[in-house]
Amino acid sequence: MGDKTFFTLPKPLPGRLNVVFTLLQKPPRIKGVKWVSGDPKKVLKELRKMGYKSTILGGGAYLNTLFLKKKLVDEIVLTIEPKIFGKGLSLFNEDFDLDLKLLSAKKINHNSIILRYKVLH
């Protein structure tokens, strides 16, 4: 995730390594957080060397766009909630075309649905 997203959280997400992309020169030392910068492909390679087989990108528009343009995303999971925010938050910060294939649609409660898509590169 990006540092803007991370700093909206009350604390690091439990039970996992929180990898946070940042441009901060001296990010704070926080248990369970790995601060990174630079090429996402290199970061993913380093995580694989550490034994991680899969990752979840919980980024904002900038990171989502960066990872997709580098073809580093193989699935997109969207949660549909019964709430409309007007302009809302953008998922991406640039225009591009992306073809998806629906893998699953799961109703998680009486109002919410999780859609899982495969990214077709």
Residue ranges and their predicted role:
Residues 1-121:
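Enzymes that bind and transform nitrogen-containing heteroaromatic metabolites
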